[in-house]
Design a protein with these regions (language model features):
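Divalent metal-dependent catalytic cores for phosphoryl transfer on phosphate-bearing substrates
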Residues: 7-126
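N-terminal intrinsically disordered, cationic/polar leader segments
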Residues: 107, 129-137, 146-154
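C-terminal membrane module of polytopic membrane proteins
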Residues: 113, 138, 143-144
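Short, surface-exposed polybasic-aromatic patches that bind anionic ligands, especially phosphate groups
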Residues: 2
Length: 154
C-alpha cells in the first residue's frame, strides 16, 4: 500500500521525483530483513534491537549503491535520507526528520498505511453492533466504527 500511495502522490505532485520516491517506498523497510529473525520466530535480532530497521536499511542500501559504478552521489544521499526519515519524527524512531519532499511524501504514505492497518485490526476484532470501541493510543483517539465499515463487513 505504501508504494501505491507514493505512486499516486508522484502522479499528483509534480515537485516529487517519481523514481526516487517509488524506489524509497519499495526499500523503506528493507532493514526489517535483518532486524527480525527468520520465520516463524520473527523475534528481534541483537543487531535489530541495538540499531533498528531504519538505520540498518539505510546502511544496507548504502552498501548496495557503492557496488553500482557511477551511481550519482547526491541521489544516493537522497535515497538514504528518505529511508532514514520515513518515520517522520525523532520520537517515532527516525534519526532524521524529512528534509526533502520525497521523504515527506514517503512518511505520509507509511504513516497512513500504519494507522489504517491499525484501524482495520480494531474493526476486525470488534462486534459489528458496538459503535464506540474505546481509546487507541497509536491513533490517539477514541475509535468509532463508521456505518459504512459495519455495512461492508456484514
Amino acid at each position: 500500500a505504501v508504494t501505491k500511495m507514493c505512486v499516486f502522490l508522484a502522479d499528483n505532485y509534480p515537485i516529487l521525483d517519481r523514481d526516487l520516491l517509488v524506489t524509497a517506498a519499495i526499500f523503506h523497510d528493507i532493514g526489517k530483513v535483518t532486524e527480525l529473525s527468520d520465520f516463524p520466530m520473527n523475534d528481534y535480532t541483537d543487531e535489530g534491537q541495538l540499531l533498528g530497521h531504519i538505520f540498518m536499511g539505510a546502511e544496507l542500501i548504502g552498501n548496495k549503491i557503492r557496488q553500482i559504478s557511477g551511481f550519482p552521489p547526491v541521489l544516493a544521499t537522497e535515497l538514504r535520507h528518505c529511508i532514514l526519515a520515513h518515520h517522520g519524527e525523532l520520537e517515532y524512531g527516525s534519526p532524521k526528520k524529512p528534509a526533502i519532499a520525497e521523504a515527506m511524501a514517503l512518511n505520509f504514505a507509511d504513516n497512513t498505511d500504519a494507522k489504517l492497518e491499525t484501524m482495520t485490526e480494531i474493526y476486525d476484532k470488534a462486534n459489528p453492533t458496538t459503535e464506540w470501541l474505546g481509546f487507541n493510543r497509536f491513533v490517539d483517539s477514541n475509535i468509532r466504527q463508521s456505518t459504512g465499515s459495519v455495512a461492508k463487513r456484514k
